[in-house]
Amino acid sequence: MITDFLLAFSILAVSTTLGVSNLNKQCRDLLQCSIQKKCVNLPVLSKLVDGKNISAEMYDDIDKYTDYGCIFTTGCQDECNDCPLCLTSKLQIVDILSGEKSSAECPTLMDCALKCVAESNQDIFQINKCLRQDCAFHCFDGSCPKCSGFITRVFNQMCAAGNFRQKIKGYSGPCYEMFHEIVRAKFADRFEKNGKTRGHSG
């Protein structure tokens, strides 16, 4: 149950004081561990994307088969603790569940997550659903670039390890642009509603 919540909250992977350049160096071991310890179910994802066009369903599959509970604790705890962004995200989960706002960064994302908790009546499944349906978009709408940057790097690792560039139909660009297109497919209606045709995925 708690792993499901961590998975939903991972899409939020909220702020840190580190910039993107430091993230690459300090979190490289964590990203590699996520593949080595099978926190990402790469065999299943590789089959699901093989021969498929980019779609919203592809985003849902990546979400479903990436276990951030494993990344945060059971599989890559040491690597997570050495990566300030990952450690910060774990600590913020506690703050979110207690209804506290510990950071002034990514206010739209944080406010959405806090609202999910406040209106959930402590129902973890309702929190999970709310975060996925209402809040994940704010990781990619340009209001929280550190969130989108981190999630994109997790995807880049699975993309390279799973050879997604050779498997996804009609796509030959780099992994980070692939994820950008997947995010855009998932949240197309919300980007259009907000007057944006393209999202931000790092």
UniProtKB/Swiss-Prot annotation:
Residues annotated as glycosylated: 53
Domain of life: Eukaryota
Topological domain spans for side Cytoplasmic: 1-6
Pfam families: DUF5332
GO cellular component labels: membrane
TM helices/strands, residue ranges: 7-23
Keywords annotated in UniProt: Glycoprotein, Membrane, Signal-anchor, Transmembrane, Transmembrane helix
Subcellular location: Membrane
Bilayer disposition of the protein: Single-pass type II membrane protein
UniProt topological domain (Extracellular) ranges: 24-202
Matches recorded under PANTHER family: PROTEIN CBG06620, PROTEIN DCT-5-RELATED
Protein known as: Uncharacterized protein C29G2.6
Biological source species: Caenorhabditis elegans
